[in-house]
Amino acid sequence: SFAGILDDADITAALAACKAEGSFKHVEFFAKIGLAGKKVFAIIDQDKSDFVEEDELKLFLQVFSAGARALTDAETKAGDSDGDGKIGVDEFAQMIKG
C-alpha cells in the first residue's frame, strides 16, 4: 500500500497519462508519482525474489489502482535489457532513469 507515502492526486495523474495501450513511459510514470527506484522495486517484487518477473510488471499499475490496465508485452519487455524474462534491481534502476 502507498497510503501516507504517495499523493493520491499524483497517482491519479500518472495512471491517467498511461491509460492508452502503448503509452506507458517508465521514467515519466515514476517521476510523476515521486517514488524512488528501490522502494518501487520492493513493492513490485511481490514474491521477494529480487527480480521483477514479467507477470509482476505486467500487472503493476494495478498496485496503484485496481482498475488500471495491464501493461502490454512491449511495455513489460522495455526494461528487460538482457532478455531473460525478468528485471533485476540494476536493470530496474536503469529503466526508471531513462
UniProtKB/Swiss-Prot annotation:
Record has Cell membrane as a keyword: no
A Gene Ontology molecular function term of the record: calcium ion binding
GO cellular component terms listed in the entry, alphabetical order: cytoplasm
Domain EF-hand: 32-67, 67-98
Residues reported in the UniProt entry to bind Ca(2+) 2: D80, D82, D84, K86, E91
Function noted in UniProt: In muscle, parvalbumin is thought to be involved in relaxation after contraction. It binds two calcium ions.
Name of the protein this chain belongs to: Parvalbumin beta 1
Lineage of origin: Eukaryota, Metazoa, Chordata, Craniata, Vertebrata
